[in-house]
Amino acid sequence: MSLYYHTLANGLRLVHIMTPSRVAWCGLAVNAGSRDEASGYYGLAHFVEHTIFKGTTHRRAWHILNRMERVGGELNAYTTKEGTMLYSVFPDEHLPRAVDLLADLVQWSVFPQEELDRERDVVLEEAASYRDTPSDAVYDDFEDLLFAGSELGHNILGRKEDLERLTRDDCMRYLKTLYVPANMAFFSVGPARPERVFGLAEKAFGGMSHALAPRHRAVPTAVAPFNKVIQIGTHQAHTVVGAQVPDMKHPLRHALMLLNNILGGPGMNSLLNVELRERRGYVYTVESTLTLLSDCGWMEIYLGCDPDDVKSSLRVIDRITARLGQELLPERRLEAYKKQYCGQLVVAADSSEFMAMRAGRGLLYHGSVSTVAQTIESIQAVTPEDIARAAAYLAHDRLSSLTFQ
């Protein structure tokens, strides 16, 4: 695997990872997400992500949908709290087609009114499906509470009343303001030579203006810990417990990543799965997630269990996080945790999709892409003291919880 970088005259950053696979990926990472929406426009970032595919000055919605599909590829996108990804996967000989299509979308989308009205119904149904899925909805509501009063304190899908009044002008303004070269990064993974990739990107994106995206993000303040229970009448209780943690550039970020994996990573031998499911039979599902943004972060532990077992499960979580924050892990045990996490990274890196998304995010937020080897080196440098400092963010007096039952 070889990494290559280039920057266009208008400020668009490019990265290409050269691999021998015949399957290629390319896309745009955009530094714009739900936190960039003004009050009254919640859901706009996600709505633009949906409707950007609905027509340009050169193509109708059907032509956009069919452009990559007809050659066996896919075109897709997703929105997060502070980012949007537009990307395509395809047989490598169709790289020019994919680059040209992405450029068309971000430069020439027109958001036809009839398409907006139709897609609005689709997005409203998507939001409704989340509300019908407590294991998803509890995350959104927990984060709304954890960041109450800040630009992160509303969910990505938005509110029905806001979605219903979003206009074509709102979409155009958002696109023209935030989808600009200095606020985006182009990424590519595949067998093409870097000069070919960068040449295609120059031709497709070089004409975009050198505009700077306005940035008014405010660092969220800490909220008082809360413990809320909402009755929704389900057989199973759905609980999220967590706290705010430092941002993606903080010195403890790798310790937080490792801690998250120790607590509730994908392995069946994670601490919480062993203690709550295997030993006590309290839960059916338990998992931990870590989200690191440019100026803040949060760690969440989700558990699905019988309502009668929620309090007992929370006490176990409290004991485990307290112990990790107060007692240093033995070196031998920490090395075992590192070995597992680093092995998981190696396995994940075998995926071109993993590499592509990692490349886009890395270039957008850090200005470069960390290789898996570099990440492993950083994980290996984590000390028992680092784990204790990271776990201190999950101390009892910092933890909040939300339960649907």
Segments from the language model and where they lie:
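His/Glu-based metal-binding/catalytic segments typifying zinc-dependent metallopeptidases
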Residues: M18-R22, G27-A29, L212-N269
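Short, Gly/Pro- and small/polar-rich lid/capping loops
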Residues: M1-N10
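Polar low-complexity intrinsically disordered regions
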Residues: S2, E195, P225-N227
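Charge-rich, well-structured scaffold segments of protease-associated domains
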Residues: T7, A61-A213, V219, V229, ...
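Short, conserved beta-strand segments within well-ordered enzyme catalytic domains
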Residues: V15, G27-A29, I52, N76-Y78, ...
